[in-house]
A protein has these predicted regions:
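Alpha-helical metal-binding/catalytic segments enriched in His/Glu/Asp
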Residues: 1-32
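Metal-dependent peptidase/peptidase-like ectodomains
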Residues: 25-131, 136-137, 143
């Protein structure tokens, strides 16, 4: 996904007005180690970093009709977020599991701690009306039975249109 995003930026008729850094970090589950290192030791001056958008563990099992932007209520990025969602015909949903405190448990939080506006954007659970599956249940079931197990492999269902939308 990140390579596709990079290729998309590369193919733009005009380059973005600002540089785009695509960083792949690791060790989130071990305490946000990779993102903390990058946020602490960026490859450019920290004051030149205007935003961080984190994509982690996207669920592309079904069509996407909404997104959940963790940290939006604490960020100055709500205006461009709303414009992008509107452009993609996506609704913006609230944190479906506030008790999990995902805002402080994901890589974007390393940037928040350094004063860099950041969002962690996940696909929500709303999907097309003809989908008979309650995605809030099925996605959570996948997470508890498949995620980080030997079954978490490339044979998973994958909705390419959902990936393109995300």
């Amino acid at each position: 996904i990140l390579l596709s995003i990079a290729r998309t930026f590369q193919r733009l008729p005009e380059p973005p007005r600002r540089s785009v850094i695509i960083a792949v970090v690791t060790a989130e589950e071990s305490g946000l180690l990779g993102s903390d290192y990058f946020a602490t030791h960026p490859t450019v001056k920290r004051e030149n970093i205007v935003a961080n958008l984190s994509l982690d563990m996207p669920f592309f099992f079904h069509p996407i009709l909404d997104i959940v932007p963790y940290g939006a209520e604490h960020s100055s990025l709500s205006k461009p977020l709303t414009a992008a969602a509107r452009y993609l015909n996506l609704e913006i949903g609230p944190d479906p599991f506030p008790e999990r405190v995902i805002f402080i448990r994901s890589d974007h939080f390393s940037f928040v701690k350094k004063g860099i506006p950041s969002l962690f954007i996940k696909s929500g659970f709303k999907t097309v009306a003809e989908d008979p599956v309650d995605r809030s249940v099925s996605d959570l079931a996948w997470r508890s039975t498949t995620y980080h197990t030997p079954r978490d492999d490339m044979t998973q269902a994958f909705d390419f249109n959902a990936a393109a939308t995300h």
